[in-house]
Amino acid sequence: MTIKWLSRGVSREKAFFVSETSLRKLRFWKVSELFMAENATDHQVKRELKTRHLSMIALGGSIGTGLFVASGSAISTAGPGGGLLAYVAMGLMVYFLMTSLGEMATNMPISGSFAAYSTKYVDPALGFAMGWNYWFNWAITLAVDISTAAIVMKYWLPNVPGWIWSVSVLVIIFLINALTVKAFGETEYWMAMIKVVTVLVFLVVGVLTIFGIMGGHATGLENFTYKKAPFVGGVPAILGVFVVAGFSFQGTELVGITAGESATPEKSIPKAINQVFWRILLFYILAIFVIACIIPYTSPDLLGSEASDIAISPFTLVFQRAGLAAAASVMNAVILTSVISAANSGMYASSRMLYSLAIQGNAPRYFEHTTSHGVPLRAQVATTIVGALAFITSIAGPEVYTWLVAASGLTGFIAWLGIAISHFRFRRAFVKQGHDVKELKYHAKLFPVGPLLALILCLLVIAGQNTGAFIHFDWEQILITYLSVPLFVVLFVYYKIRHKTKLIPLDQVDISSTRTEQRHD
């Protein structure tokens, strides 16, 4: 019976001996954890996020202006039945994607998340392209969020210059993220709590209004049979709402990035992921059902819903219908919270992604440095500068800003594609290398149907972003809409040609479990 060393670079006193027979009996993930501490390097992020933080971040990432504002246009476009069907389909897709991400993140809870998984399980070129694309997306989205915050603030203080509010929000979220990851987690926890309470109150008020207990006339389900309802515009309209619904769920993948700083990822990630399905059902499907019951799809207010006119947010309209005073002001405060939360999450996600890219050798080593509190401050400063410059272009050069936003428009969907592909490869490699699925700490649902269905729906959403532009051969609109795709391809091809990478054979895929980012020189 041969004896082998299990670790490299470990002192004789700390080395472990395990027989080959015993090694075969150990679960693959336990082996790496025997010397996990020995592999840790200086300047790592800190694992200070608790289960409640991850659960609320997963929830908060799927509740925002997409629900509070854009849900009205979904009902107006496809009718109550079409709107519900589109959100159910997108919710199912997101659930499968999150269970796929959860399986990988529980096995390897690192800040690089799906970009790192693409590198390990598919092709380093894919991880490189996804990482930089995702970082750029959130850096630009940061500018969008602080601009939206200024629009929301004009509801109360229309005479104050908008840039003051934008700069104020940027400074606040920078300071929050610069403190500790726990400060970020606590901030997100309470902002998500505000959104959750708002939706719960809305559902209660909405149900009471439907039955006529509040707001006078009982609407019941009459709006589902009103004129052309429940399905309006047929399949094209439903496909159009897929796009709206898809954007509404953007950000749910953040839970994968927070896994890198979770104190107990084996416990926190499965719990957060398992709650996604019920939360999507409760907060999205039921909320849209309530709106559809109370407000007919023909209402012009639904089509015009946007952050600049909170008075016609579907949530505001329902609260006003129930006779609640100051509904618009309250919803404006909630939407402001959502915008700040999105900006806060964007700052966090982009700084961690840039940090991870540096660790992997795909970004300057300068950005892999962290403070004594585990904050990748240099990466955060770089992200803030890019976001601030993008914001300045929104004022000084609107056309440039439009193209910057277009360049990041589909990045979230591309990330979702990467999650589905990476998980499919991970599971196949896991089995190919002789492991039993039961060894995994968390199992994705309905594999391989789940990730394949998510992949197909995601491609459908990307393709359907602007079908009208193709019909009318509007090449400028096509370029603006789909600019993210060629940019992603350029990054992918550049890395592939420079480093001559290939699709990693299944029997060579590294499926080992680790909780630390591995430096690649």
Model region roles, listed by residue range:
Residues 40-45, 84, 157, 161, ...:
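Helix-loop-helix junctions that connect adjacent transmembrane segments
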Residues 45-46, 51, 70-166, 173-175, ...:
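Extracellular loop-to-transmembrane helix junctions
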Residues 110, 133-147, 246-262, 325-365, ...:
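Membrane-helix boundary/coupling elements in multi-pass transport proteins
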Residues 115-125, 146-166, 198, 258-267, ...:
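Helix-loop-helix connectors at the membrane interface of multi-pass transporters/channels
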Residues 116, 123, 155, 241, ...:
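TM-loop-TM module centered on a large, flexible mid-protein loop between adjacent transmembrane helices
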Residues 163-221, 250, 273-277, 281, ...:
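Membrane-interface loop-to-helix entry segments
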